[in-house]
């Protein structure tokens, strides 16, 4: 694995844009998005889809269904499947894979229990995992990767390595944007936003895959539980899985998806051999 650390300072414009987000009714906006992207009226959903493809320059040649009008809703288009050959896995069976298309925001060692967010900002593993100190201790001095999914990216999340689900935690919170300007300005952003933390046991020890919500994320889904958000509660909801009902998901297989875009954070309890990252822009299935 490689180390990638972006210490770009926040600008005055970053702070201004972030300040405008605080008073917004985050969950109300997300509920409206949740409704709008599921409208099946042909002219409406086709207008949204075609405008989105044009504005964000979406490459439909990778999609399993290339015809934009074939999708029953905007959400079906947004969470579209890709052709199997679009994301080939590396030949090395031990390589740890990127769980998603996107941009690496940060990647590197967990310093004791602290995860680097941006210059001047950090949060702890316990804060990210809903305050569970015992669970957080499993990732002490481990490794993390934070990947930002932009609107144009593929929005299904896949397994970095094979794992058996131990626990899923739905943690309530705000729904700030997770665009780079908020990462640079909002303290403890990923530990404040609503999120779903999925804890897996792997051959290399525990692994967490945390799906972080954002202001336009209509919902988060996993392949074993279906749609998890909305609604948003006021307390963390824990789902524990025993050996007889715990799904095992193979490396590279889908484990969840964002219905609109956001951020994925992965945690491991050991530090891999050092490597060199060639680009912060990655695709699902690439070695990280």
UniProtKB/Swiss-Prot annotation:
Localisation per UniProt entry: Cell membrane
Co-factor note (free text): Binds 1 pyruvoyl group covalently per subunit.
A Pfam family recorded for this sequence: PS_Dcarbxylase
Record membrane topology: Peripheral membrane protein
EC number annotated for this UniProt entry: 4.1.1.65
PANTHER family for this protein: PHOSPHATIDYLSERINE DECARBOXYLASE, PHOSPHATIDYLSERINE DECARBOXYLASE PROENZYME, MITOCHONDRIAL
Family: Belongs to the phosphatidylserine decarboxylase family. PSD-B subfamily. Prokaryotic type I sub-subfamily.
Protein name: Phosphatidylserine decarboxylase proenzyme
Species of origin: Alkalilimnicola ehrlichii (strain ATCC BAA-1101 / DSM 17681 / MLHE-1)
Lineage: Bacteria, Pseudomonadati, Pseudomonadota, Gammaproteobacteria, Chromatiales
Gene: psd
